[in-house]
């Protein structure tokens, strides 16, 4: 493959250049799952821990996984509700893949805090 990636092969988030893509080699559905997503509650500033699932049907482009990992790490100190974060991730992934938002599905499962588990899906 003759594609130059900015994040892949460069340790640390200083190499982050956005969600990177590569030409779809012919797959129909891609699902990415990570349990490394964290953000903070915008009211209490307490940490929230998530499992995120990103699923899309690629047309011309696929997401490069290292750039997704770095992208998700950027939310570490962001104050955001689970529901808003699911929509933000969906919209930014769709833009990177040049898809309509309806072509990307994001599910965030927030780990229990205060005895309540939240799942927000787009």
Residue ranges and their predicted role:
Residues 1-122:
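N-terminal intrinsically disordered, cationic/polar leader segments
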């Amino acid at each position: 493959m003759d594609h130059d990636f900015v994040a892949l092969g460069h340790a640390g988030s200083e190499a982050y250049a956005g969600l990177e893509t590569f030409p779809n080699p012919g797959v129909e559905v891609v699902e990415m799952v990570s349990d490394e997503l964290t953000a903070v509650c915008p009211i209490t500033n307490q940490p929230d821990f998530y499992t995120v699932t990103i699923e899309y049907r690629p047309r011309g482009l696929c997401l490069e996984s290292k750039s997704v990992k770095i992208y998700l790490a950027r939310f570490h100190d962001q104050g955001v509700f689970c529901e808003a974060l699911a929509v933000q991730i969906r919209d930014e992934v769709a833009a990177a893949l040049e898809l309509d938002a309806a072509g990307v599905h994001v599910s965030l499962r927030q780990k229990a805090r205060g005895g309540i588990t939240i799942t927000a899906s787009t």
